């Protein structure tokens, strides 16, 4: 599995065309779907950039970006398969934090997210607040996160 962690780190570095100091990644891998998104900090003003903004922010081809992101999703699918093959509990989502020095932390979540009252957007909004302190721009979504977390 260590090799997979290394490949994931290298793929993230390939996807981000500029300098970064820390990456915050959310991956959700189920039997029939996979979603991976991340934010990263840059050295300039400690700015946080959302992964989906890379093509516009760095003038990168959307096709190349989508290909790299698909390859990243496949690595997380492989990681989940490795856990399953090793008779480990099968996780449904995870948070990965990675700093420029290569230090990383993985937090696996084993909740049955399909049975959760939260939809995918709500899970992401809560994750973004807990990990980055970012509230949604939409007022209704912001109120949901505040209410759900009891802020």
Curated annotation (Swiss-Prot):
<feature type="coiled-coil region">
    <location>
        <begin position="62"/>
        <end position="90"/>
    </location>
</feature>
<comment type="function">
    <text>Immunity component of one of 6 LXG toxin-immunity modules in this strain. They promote kin selection, mediate competition in biofilms, and drive spatial segregation of different strains, indicating that LXG toxins may help avoid warfare between strains in biofilms. Mediates intercellular competition during biofilm formation; disruption of the operon disadvantages the bacteria, but overexpression of the cognate immunity protein restores growth in competition with wild-type. In situ neutralizes the toxic effect of cognate toxin YeeF.</text>
</comment>
<keyword id="KW-0963">Cytoplasm</keyword>
<dbReference type="Pfam" id="PF04634">
    <property type="entry name" value="YezG-like"/>
</dbReference>
<comment type="subunit">
    <text>Interacts with cognate toxin YeeF but not with non-cognate toxin YobL. The interaction probably inhibits the toxic activity of YeeF. May bind with a stoichiometry of 2:2 to YeeF.</text>
</comment>
<dbReference type="GO" id="GO:0005737">
    <property type="term" value="C:cytoplasm"/>
</dbReference>
<dbReference type="InterPro" id="IPR006728">
    <property type="entry name" value="YezG-like"/>
</dbReference>
<keyword id="KW-0175">Coiled coil</keyword>
<protein>
    <recommendedName>
        <fullName>Immunity protein YezG</fullName>
    </recommendedName>
</protein>
<dbReference type="InterPro" id="IPR036170">
    <property type="entry name" value="YezG-like_sf"/>
</dbReference>
